[in-house]
């Protein structure tokens, strides 16, 4: 158990303070060392779960058990003398044990788990009640707490204020409803019964929070229109413009025409009459009108103040009293304070009343002595004061507390009238020109009075008119225009002397000596009086004229200086703080920027268009070059193909004729020449014939061949061979038939296939020829072996071979014609050479056939594989 620590000792009879905060206490045991005279017990920041064994502290007045783990508060039931109970930030679920605490004045249950406001009505002496940051959903019955001044309910889940007129006491001055769930702004109408409410907080509720669907509006004038005596709303002092707007909403507008449930309609109306300004100090047309009204109100207040001063100083006093008061230089502020203490003060309304002066700027108040702080001038139960501006409201500093908002200190004195005139002269100059001239004149007159050490009443218009009338009477009397009794002249002279003291302090001693003589000694006769009067009248007139001239010159200089200062200040203020001037400058900048952006955009578009055109031109040129290059390549290929065909045609014709037909057969040679001529004619005709569908429009590249061309070429070659065989049939039949060997009709297909392969592999002729020679030699050897065994059978079938000879000859002629049409001669030449070699081998093997003809040896090469 921690030991109690005595922090401070009170005087005898008042007890002491025990602070056990932060000691890690979990419970209060029965051996609690509590003295009988302890009046304050602090148990903050421990781990106490239950309040027990506090009966020993019977005289306990203040108990604080903040930031613990309390679940119940029944342990305070026997502390009947308790006045302050601080139990915030615990886990208390319900209010209990307060029925006997009739002396309780201050109760803090913030930050707990309360769901209802129960059993608090018994604490009739309660003045401060903090139930913030709980789970309270509706206002409970507090009507019996007639002394309650402060009720803090922020941070709960209250949705309606419908029960406020019945449950809340009329004496309530501070009410905090911030951070709740009030969704209808019309609920504020239920607070109209709280006539003494001065401070209200309703911020961070859904009804006043900005949403994208609802236009911005200023809810402050609407709340003030229901709570007429409200001075502070959401931590800011109610300004005079807001008060005027609230009065307009109450009297002429539709502020009270809406009922609970019409939140959207109310918000739309407030958005039109009380729009929300986004910039600080931004004034709309309505704000300008309100400022003019307030400036005129201030001007009339000053007029009433001057009239009250003049009427207080207007009664004539004896010469001795006036002479004795002038050298003392009594300030008008002291006179006003005396009049304020002697006469009663009555509040006129909410915005020109006694309460609004308490909300002045504290920093300005603290810069001046307390003896000068006053702005109240009363006459005939009329209270006058200066109006607070919006700048004062925005710059005011409020005292913060644990409950978000606390009352503003109202005991401070307001500003003095002279200081108020100096401070507000500049502001009035910015609002209204007419009022500005009056304020500048008042400021200049104050400076002049300070330099010449004359009191404030000497500068009033009434006193100046009085002095002018006195001077006129003196001049008229001297000129004999108006008969005037001698006492009047004496009084006028004395008054002028008294006034001249204020304008010429360097001649004070002389004037005082002149004044003391008539005071101490009574004039003996009329002659001495008239003599003194005749001596002083010229001097008084000259001094008065000089004084008036000096006043005019000095006043003109001050006016010029003030005009220059005011012009400079107005220019600076307009450029930096006037919303219209700032908007105009901003608009000019935006226009220039927009013009520059448009110019740059046009330039970029022009450059982009030129770039696109250049790109299109370049693309067209590339396509044209590509097309021309393809044309050139196709022409080159076509030219090569034509040259190759022509060369092959010229080179292939003689070997074929010399190989196939011997020179001793003139008939075959002539027929071959005629067939060659026909073939050449067919070659030329085939290039031009339109009916050949396989030919492309472009010249043949030489890399492809169509089947139709082969078919036509075969047909022409067959016709040629038919004509050739008819002429040489007799010579062929005369040769030996035994040397000619053809197997079957299938050999013809093999020969045609070999010719097709040779046509495809024309580029590798030499390699193919060598391989073909090896292959044919091997095949020929095998066939020779077979021929030796089947020689007898071959002789029997010689007739069959003779019958098949024309067909074989036609086939060979077809192959030769195909080679001629396509211009491929090397394979045919290789075939002829190979057949010659094979015929030599056959001659060696078959020695009994010497009469074999070379032509038939060529035909003998067609071997079946």
From Swiss-Prot:
Gene Ontology CC annotation, any one: centriole
Source species, domain of life: Eukaryota
Modified sites of kind Phosphothreonine: 542
Residue span of region CCP110-binding: 300-750
Domain IQ positions: 558-587
InterPro entries membership: Cilia_flagella_integrity, Leu-rich_rpt, LRR_dom_sf
Cellular compartments annotated: Cytoplasm, Cytoskeleton, Microtubule organizing center, Centrosome; Cytoplasm, Cytoskeleton, Microtubule organizing center, Centrosome, Centriole
LRR repeat positions: 37-58, 59-80, 81-102, 103-124, 125-146, 147-168, 171-192, 196-205
Disordered, as annotated region: 506-529, 715-769
Compositionally biased spans, kind Polar residues: 725-738
MF (Gene Ontology): calmodulin binding
Positions carrying Phosphoserine: 308, 413, 500, 530, 763
GO BP terms in the entry: cell projection organization; negative regulation of cilium assembly; regulation of mitotic spindle assembly
Domain LRRCT intervals: 211-249
Interaction with MPHOSPH9: annotated span: 587-865
Keyword annotations: Calmodulin-binding, Cilium biogenesis/degradation, Cytoplasm, Cytoskeleton, Leucine-rich repeat, Phosphoprotein, Repeat
Gene3D superfamilies per UniProt: Ribonuclease Inhibitor
Basic and acidic residues: compositionally biased ranges: 508-527, 741-760
A Pfam short name: LRR_9
Entry function: Acts as a key negative regulator of ciliogenesis in collaboration with CCP110 by capping the mother centriole thereby preventing cilia formation. Required for recruitment of CCP110 to the centrosome.
Assembly mode: Interacts with CALM1, CEP76, KIF24 and TALPID3. Interacts with CCP110. ENKD1 competes with CEP97 for binding to CCP110, destabilizing the interaction between CP110 and CEP97 which promotes the removal of CCP110 and CEP97 from the mother centriole and allows the initiation of ciliogenesis. Via its interaction with CCP110, may indirectly interact with HERC2 and NEURL4. Interacts with MPHOSPH9.
Name of protein: Centrosomal protein of 97 kDa
Organism taxonomic ancestry: Eukaryota, Metazoa, Chordata, Craniata, Vertebrata
